Each structure stands twice: as structure tokens, then as C-alpha cells.
Amino acid sequence: MLSRSEGQQALEAASEIIGSKGVNRETLAHAYYLRGNAYRQNGNVRMALNSYLESMELDPDGPAAEAYRHIQELLDFYNKDYYNP
């Protein structure tokens, strides 16, 4: 697990790559995936899911698809009563 400062550094580095021009799709998809991981480790699940979705648009078979699925499964389990009153 990353420390808070390491997580912030990871977010900044990934966001810098995402904001750069001329980055290839594979690198961009990986940057979104890494940013999603940093958000998740910082407790910001919503932003993590958004970053994973961005990555999946660029690389549907990349690691973000599995990370997204895992978070969704956890949320479904955690919110089971919300969906099944």
C-alpha cells in the first residue's frame, strides 16, 4: 500500500501523462489504470472507477477491466440490502 504522499505523487505523475499530448493509447490506458489504483488506495472509489472506465475505453482487455469488476463486486456485496430490500 502506498503512503499518502506516495499516493499523491502517483496521482500527479499519472495525471501529468494523461494531460500530455502525443501519448500513445497503450501508455494512456496504463496511466488511467495507475491513476485509478492511486485513487482507490486513497479511498476515492468513485474517481477510481472513473479512471478505470477511461482506461477500459482505450484498452478493453487491460488490467483496468479486472480492477473495475473487483470494485463492482465489492460494492454489490457491501450494498446487497440496497439492491434487495
What are these regions, as identified by a protein language model?
Residues 6, 72-85:
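Alpha-helical linker/edge segments of TPR/alpha-solenoid repeat scaffolds
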